[in-house]
Structure formats: structure tokens, C-alpha cells
Design a protein with these regions (language model features):
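N-terminal targeting sequences that direct proteins away from the cytosol to non-cytosolic compartments
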Residues: 2-119, 209-213, 218-220, 230-265
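Conserved polar/disulfide-associated segments of primarily extracytoplasmic proteins
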Residues: 52-53, 90-231, 237
Length: 265
């Protein structure tokens, strides 16, 4: 089951208030390099010969994999993960199950519009414009996100910015479970009539693109470290995200996975 799909609340068991804390981590300038990145022997990275992440949920052995976003305008992406990580539909790689202690994730997004207010998202959407700076400005202006100042970065030869967004740690939310997955119902936010819960939403994906149709957040205190990159005129957002329950080891693994990213040009 894709970790970023929200199931109707009526199908799940509502109940426990989410317990949260604050993150004090600050973004640092990104200078990705092979040193320090997870780099196991590729011969042990998968039980199959395929290195391309595909549809569905795929358990991953340690190694380097290929992300094909299905867009000729974008290069394929190499990403190296530790043992025990999982791929969801080829555009999300994660460790653990959302809202459990070891959960972290990296997502790839083709962002279209930004919600004017992430909690009261029925107020409308903003079309930020096509550039890296346009999107960074729109996200920095979004209420309740405590956005950091965008920092210039270069990732495998491509320029962009890094910034962090967060969800207020004291935002009331109730968790509900379905199978192995745990979701957040943000009590003060607008209700999603399709899903049935109250959502905290950041942006929408370009219609018809890979991946998710909208970026909703998984819980109070969640942090998203964003790389907004210009790939020869095409914008790509890479979102490394974690929750307050994530420990330092798992956050360290998350940053190593991000720093392993290379583009096949």
C-alpha cells in the first residue's frame, strides 16, 4: 500500500491523539558527494536483476536503484538506500511505516500549485510560476510552515535551493489506523469530503504526472527538507521528510540517501 495514499476515515479506527515533539535540526548547505553516502556492493542490493523501481510496494535490499519518473524531459535518477527500505510506486522510498518511530521518506514531486493555507486549504490554490525561485517564494509565504530561508545548492551539477518546512508541533490531531498504516486527522483543518478526514496540505502535483495528486502531511511536528532543482529548465522537487518520533540514526540515514542522489544525463 502506498504510504502517501489516504484512506477514507470511515474505514479506519479513530482514536488516539498524536504525541509530538519539536525538531531543532536546521538545514545545512547541501554539497552531495559520494563520501559518506550509503554505498553497498550493488551485487547484493536486490534479489532480482532489475534496478528500476516500479509500481507497487517493493522491499529493497541495500544498494543503488534507478528512479524512472516516466518523463522524457527529466533524467532518470540514481538513489542508494540502506537495507530494509521500501519503494512505493517508484516515486517514494522510505524506511518503516508512517507515524511509527523509524519512519522517514524521500519523495519526488512535479509541483503544480501551492495551497494558500495548508490547514484551511479550501481557501484556494496559488500558481507560483515555473521557476525554482517562484516555488520557493510561494512555499516560504505559506502560513504555519515556519519556513527556513532558501539556501543555494548544487546537486550533481544542477542548481537549486534547499529549504525546510514544518507542521506546528502543537497542532491537535487524532490518529487512525488501517492495517499497518497510521494516518493523521488534523482536528482544526478543512475536511476532505472524499477521504473523510481533516487534512493539512502543502501543494498539488501536475495533473497526469507521476506520483501523488496532492502533498498532504502525515502528522504534527513533521519536517520536510526540500531540494527544489532546475534540471535544464525543468523543475523537480525532492522532499526528505521525517516526524518528531524519528531518531537521530534514521535521520542520518535519510540525509545519506538524499546525498546519494545522482542524475543520469
Amino acid at each position: 500500500m502506498t504510504q502517501f495514499h489516504r484512506w477514507p476515515l470511515a474505514l479506519a479506527m479513530a482514536g488516539t491523539l498524536l504525541s509530538v515533539g519539536c525538531s531543532s535540526e536546521q538545514p545545512t548547505e547541501a554539497d552531495p558527494s559520494p563520501e559518506g553516502s550509503a554505498s553497498p556492493d550493488s551485487s547484493t542490493a536486490s534479489e532480482t536483476d532489475s534496478r528500476v523501481l516500479g509500481a507497487g510496494t517493493q522491499a529493497l535490499a541495500a544498494g543503488t536503484y534507478e528512479v524512472d519518473l516516466g518523463e522524457e524531459r527529466l533524467p532518470n535518477i540514481e538513489i542508494t538506500v540502506p537495507d530494509g527500505w521500501t519503494s512505493d510506486d517508484g516515486w517514494v522510498v522510505r524506511n518503516g511505516v508512517v507515524n511509527t518511530p523509524h519512519w522517514v521518506a524521500v519523495q519526488f514531486w512535479d509541483v503544480d500549485e501551492v495551497y494558500a493555507h495548508p490547514c484551511h486549504w479550501r481557501d484556494g490554490l496559488i500558481q507560483p510560476g515555473p521557476t525554482v525561485a517562484d516555488l520557493a517564494t510561494a512555499l516560504a509565504d505559506q502560513p504555519l510552515r515556519d519556513a527556513t530561508e532558501p539556501v543555494d545548492i548544487v546537486v550533481d551539477g544542477f542548481e537549486g535551493v534547499q529549504m525546510e518546512l514544518s507542521v506546528p508541533a502543537d497542532m491537535p490531531a487524532r490518529r487512525y489506523e488501517l492495517g499497518d498504516d497510521v494516518y493523521a486527522d488534523f482536528l482544526g483543518c478543512d475536511r476532505d469530503e472524499v477521504v473523510g478526514d481533516r487534512a493539512f496540505k502543502s501543494w498539488t502535483g501536475v495533473p497526469g504526472s507521476w506520483g501523488g495528486s496532492e502533498r498532504y502531511q502525515q502528522g504534527p511536528g513533521q519536517v520536510d527538507r526540500l531540494w527544489i532543482l532546475d534540471l535544464d529548465g525543468e523543475r523537480l522537487v525532492i522532499d526528505a521528510t521525517y516526524l518528531p518520533s524519528t531518531d537521530a540514526q534514521d535521520r542520518g540515514d535519510l540525509w545519506q540517501v538524499m546525498e546519494s542522489i545522482r542524475f543520469e544525463t
